[in-house]
C-alpha cells in the first residue's frame, strides 16, 4: 500500500516554512494524541503518521532527500541506511509545548509547592460584628526554618544538583515509538538533592510552630463572611510563596436582636391598654435606648421601623434599620377587682365578639357562620 505524502498528512504546501509545519503538527497532534483517543486504533495510526511526517519535514537534510526521492529516500539502502525515522529526533521540545498542560508533561524543573492555605473559625458577638473589632488568634502552622532559611540544607552547605536529571527535574523515558518526559524519581522534580540536611528541620525547610496574629475585623461583617490574610498560611516549600489564612466569621445568637441582612429585628411586648389607647415606650438599640410612640388601636405583630438604627454594610452604603414588632400581652394574675372591671368592659363592647370594637373578630365569626350555613344548604 502506497504511503501518503508527508505534506498532505500535515495539510501544508511543499513550500511551507518550518513554523507552518510546526503549527500544523501541534494542531493535528492535539487532535489525534492517544491519550485523548484511548482505544481508537485509527487515531493511534494517524498520530504515528503525523509524527513521522513532522520528523522528516523539520529536518533540513531529510526534507531535501524526501523532496527529491520521496519515500524511497528512507527505504532500506536509501539515505542513512537503516531507514525509517526512528533515530535521533528529540520530541521533548514539541511535547513540552503541546501536551504539557493537558497530559502533565511539560518541560523544566517542577516548581516548589506553594504553602497550604489555612482556615480559622472566629466567633463574634453581634455587637463586635456590627462595630468591628481587633482580636488576637493563635494558629498552628508551618513556618520557614530560621536555621537553613528554607533550603533544607545544613548550615555551610547547599542543595546539590541531581545527578539523574542534571537539575532539569525531569527525565526522558522511551516507550517504544514515543519519547515521554516524566518527573525525575530521584529528586521528585526539584532538580536538587540535599546531602547534608538541616539539623532543625531535617531537610524539609519548614518547622511546626504556633503563631499569634492580630486580626482586624471590619464593622458590618456577618455569618459566612470570610476575611483573607495574604501570606499568613503555611510557608512554601524551599522558598516558595506562603499560603493564605482565611478567617471564617460566625456571629453568635443575640438575646434581643435578630439580624437579617443589614436590618435588625426585635420583639417589644406591650400591655393591652397601651395597644388600645396608645402611648410611649423605650426600646433598645445597639446605641442605647430610644423612645417609640405607639398609636392607639395597635394590633399585635405590627412593625415599627426606626431608620438608620440597624447595621452599616461592610461593603459601604446606607445603614440598615431596626424593626420593632409589638406583641400585645394578655394580662395574667388578675385580682377580683380587675376581673370585674374587665367584665364590665366586655359588656360595654356588646359581648366577647363586640362587632364595633373587634373588627377582626367580627370578620372571623361572620366567615364561620357563612361556612356552616353553606354546609347545611
From Swiss-Prot:
The J domain is necessary and sufficient to stimulate DnaK ATPase activity. Zinc center 1 plays an important role in the autonomous, DnaK-independent chaperone activity of DnaJ. Zinc center 2 is essential for interaction with DnaK and for DnaJ activity. Its cofactor is Zn(2+). This is Chaperone protein DnaJ. The keyword Lipid metabolism does not apply. Signal peptide: none annotated. Homodimer. SUPFAM superfamilies: Chaperone J-domain, DnaJ/Hsp40 cysteine-rich domain, HSP40/DnaJ peptide-binding domain. GO terms for molecular function: ATP binding; heat shock protein binding; unfolded protein binding; zinc ion binding. CXXCXGXG motif repeats lie at residues 145-152, 162-169, 184-191, 198-205. It is found in: Cytoplasm. Zn(2+) 2 binds at residues 162, 165, 184, 187. GO terms for biological process: chaperone cofactor-dependent protein refolding; DNA replication; protein refolding; response to heat. Keywords: Chaperone, Cytoplasm, DNA replication, Metal-binding, Repeat, Stress response, Zinc, Zinc-finger. Residues 5-70 form the J domain. Participates actively in the response to hyperosmotic and heat shock by preventing the aggregation of stress-denatured proteins and by disaggregating proteins, also in an autonomous, DnaK-independent fashion. Unfolded proteins bind initially to DnaJ; upon interaction with the DnaJ-bound protein, DnaK hydrolyzes its bound ATP, resulting in the formation of a stable complex. GrpE releases ADP from DnaK; ATP binding to DnaK triggers the release of the substrate protein, thus completing the reaction cycle. A zinc finger (CR-type) spans 132-210. CDD domains: DnaJ, DnaJ_C, DnaJ_zf. Belongs to the DnaJ family. Zn(2+) 1 binds at residues 145, 148, 198, 201. Disulfide bonds: none annotated. GO terms for cellular component: cytoplasm. Binds 2 Zn(2+) ions per monomer.
Amino acid at each position: 500500500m502506497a504511503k501518503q505524502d508527508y505534506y498532505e498528512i500535515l495539510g501544508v504546501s511543499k513550500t511551507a516554512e518550518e513554523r507552518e509545519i510546526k503549527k500544523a503538527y501541534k494542531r493535528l497532534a492535539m487532535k489525534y494524541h492517544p491519550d485523548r483517543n484511548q482505544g481508537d486504533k485509527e487515531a493511534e495510526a494517524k498520530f504515528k503518521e503525523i509524527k513521522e511526517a513532522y520528523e522528516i519535514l523539520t529536518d533540513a537534510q531529510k526534507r531535501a532527500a524526501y523532496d527529491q526521492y520521496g519515500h524511497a529516500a528512507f527505504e532500506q539502502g536509501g539515505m542513512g541506511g537503516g531507514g525509517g525515522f526512528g533515530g535521533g529526533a528529540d520530541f521533548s521540545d514539541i511535547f513540552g509545548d503541546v501536551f504539557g498542560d493537558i497530559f502533565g508533561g511539560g518541560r523544566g524543573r517542577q516548581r516548589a509547592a506553594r504553602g497550604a492555605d489555612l482556615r480559622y473559625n472566629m466567633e463574634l458577638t453581634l455587637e463586635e460584628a456590627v462595630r468591628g473589632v481587633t482580636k488576637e488568634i493563635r494558629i498552628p502552622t508551618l513556618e520557614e526554618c530560621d536555621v537553613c532559611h528554607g533550603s533544607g540544607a545544613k548550615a555551610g552547605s547547599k542543595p546539590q544538583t541531581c545527578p539523574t536529571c542534571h537539575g532539569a527535574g525531569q527525565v526522558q523515558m522511551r516507550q517504544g515509538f514515543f519519547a515521554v518526559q516524566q518527573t525525575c524519581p530521584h529528586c521528585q522534580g526539584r532538580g536538587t538533592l540535599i546531602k547534608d540536611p538541616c539539623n532543625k528541620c531535617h531537610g524539609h525547610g519548614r518547622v511546626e510552630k504556633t503563631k499569634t496574629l492580630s486580626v482586624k475585623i471590619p464593622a458590618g461583617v456577618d455569618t459566612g463572611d470570610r476575611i483573607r490574610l495574604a501570606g499568613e498560611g503555611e510557608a512554601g516549600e524551599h522558598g516558595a510563596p506562603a499560603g493564605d489564612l482565611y478567617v471564617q466569621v460566625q456571629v453568635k445568637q443575640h438575646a434581643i436582636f435578630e439580624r437579617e441582612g443589614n436590618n435588625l429585628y426585635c420583639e417589644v411586648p406591650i400591655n393591652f391598654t397601651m395597644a388600645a389607647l396608645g402611648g410611649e415606650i423605650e426600646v433598645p438599640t445597639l446605641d442605647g435606648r430610644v423612645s417609640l410612640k405607639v398609636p392607639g388601636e395597635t394590633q399585635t405583630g405590627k412593625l415599627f421601623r426606626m431608620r438608620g438604627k440597624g447595621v452599616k454594610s461592610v461593603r459601604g452604603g446606607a445603614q440598615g434599620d431596626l424593626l420593632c414588632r409589638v406583641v400585645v400581652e394578655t394580662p395574667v394574675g388578675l385580682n377580683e377587682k380587675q376581673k370585674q372591671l374587665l367584665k364590665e368592659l366586655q359588656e360595654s363592647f356588646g359581648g366577647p365578639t363586640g362587632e364595633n370594637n373587634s373588627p377582626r373578630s367580627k370578620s372571623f365569626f361572620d366567615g364561620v357562620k357563612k361556612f356552616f350555613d353553606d354546609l347545611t344548604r
